[in-house]
């Protein structure tokens, strides 16, 4: 019985991958992958963070994704992920594993030059995003963007190089410590110790590592990322908190805001998710930072539907 179920699940999963890769479902077309026009709005109404850059249009954590986000007036923050190479340098990538045809390796096992000199191939396997948007608002656009990114060749860039493409946007720098805290902090210090960090939020879901960073650099703005409601209390040790979208609680958010904390919500990949959180937050829905792969769609929807809260 277990084998049959496993085969069935494999067929379903494989079919979904094929559909996403084809880009033909429900009349999807190339035009729907372009950035939505956002006009006639006050860009101060809602705070938006472009997750890993404009990652629904360009490969995440690349200079093109950052450049696109930097040009969008409605984007307030650009989020990016930093991790260590084997020789202790910081590059921008969410996952340690990288892929190319007939090749797979880990960034942590490669030197900075090896990582940044090689081209890799991007593959998206986020089936949940596909199914969540089959019948949802802006679903065609979201699914089409997802399919158009598959198979694109890209380059991993260093942290300093990536920041050059962010213009005057604020930065959410997600720190992938991976149990290498001391070496990671030293790499951060090499880059930021003599620089103005007033527009940078250092964030991580590793509370121990982030507290160490905050202890030795109290002047750096640090935000804890939480995915479980039992960890919300960690906010008292940091300057801000990033809350996973499915554990948002209006009472907690209001208290955090009243205490001067930055509150961000992650990561929005459908309009239905935006509606659920904005409804839960009520009058505070315009006081938080929305982190999303679809900054154009999310901003436009929020302004049109929740601007009177």
Sequence positions of predicted segments:
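Phosphate-group recognition and catalysis centered on beta-loop-alpha active-site segments
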Residues: 2-309
């Amino acid at each position: 019985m277990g084998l049959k179920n496993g085969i069935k699940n494999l067929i379903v999963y494989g079919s979904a991958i094929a559909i996403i890769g084809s880009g033909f479902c429900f009349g999807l077309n190339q035009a729907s992958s372009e950035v939505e026009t956002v006009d006639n709005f006050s860009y101060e109404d809602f705070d938006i963070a472009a997750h890993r850059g404009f990652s629904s249009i360009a490969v995440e954590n690349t200079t093109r994704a950052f450049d696109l986000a930097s040009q969008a007036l409605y984007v307030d923050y650009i989020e990016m992920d930093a991790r260590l190479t084997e020789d202790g340098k910081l590059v921008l990538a969410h996952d340690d594993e990288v892929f190319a045809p007939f090749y797979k390796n880990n960034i942590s096992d490669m030197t900075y030059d090896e990582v940044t000199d090689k081209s890799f191939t991007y593959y998206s396997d986020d089936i949940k995003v596909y199914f969540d948007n089959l019948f949802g608002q802006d679903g065609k656009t979201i699914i089409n963007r997802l399919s158009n990114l598959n198979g694109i060749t890209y380059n991993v860039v260093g942290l300093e190089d990536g920041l050059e493409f962010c213009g005057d946007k604020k930065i959410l720098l997600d720190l992938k410590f991976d149990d290498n805290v001391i070496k990671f902090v030293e790499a951060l210090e090499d880059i930021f110790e003599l620089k103005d960090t007033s527009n940078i939020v250092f964030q991580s879901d590793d509370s121990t590592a982030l507290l160490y960073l905050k202890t030795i650099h109290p002047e750096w703005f640090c935000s804890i990322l939480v995915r479980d409601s039992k960890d919300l209390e960690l906010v008292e040790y940091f300057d801000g908190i990033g809350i996973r979208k499915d554990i948002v609680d209006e009472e907690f958010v209001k208290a955090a805001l009243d205490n001067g904390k930055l509150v961000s919500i992650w990561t929005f990949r459908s309009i239905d998710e935006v509606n659920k959180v904005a409804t839960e937050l009520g009058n505070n829905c315009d006081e938080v930072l929305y982190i999303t792969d679809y900054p154009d769609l999310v901003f436009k929807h929020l302004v049109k539907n929740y601007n009177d809260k």
